[in-house]
Amino acid sequence: MGNEFRVCDDCQATNVKTLVPKLKKVDSCATIEVGCQSYCGPGRKKSFAFVNNRPVAAPTEDELIVKIEAKLNK
């Protein structure tokens, strides 16, 4: 089973146009779902994505990608 990324297209701190291409670089075979993730509180202040049903958040997109890569390499 491949990895799954879920990102919100409505949260203020998440820019789908820049985040999705970065996620594709992390895992080009992963499933990427874009839509509301009901994670609005943290999504106002931090960039986030759900990685295999687990939330991962960071102050910036670049920091988020580093955390996601670390999570997938475990």
From Swiss-Prot:
Coiled coil: none annotated. InterPro entries: DUF1450 (IPR009910), UPF0741 (IPR020880). It comes from the Bacteria. Pfam families: DUF1450. Belongs to the UPF0741 family. This is UPF0741 protein BCB4264_A5507.
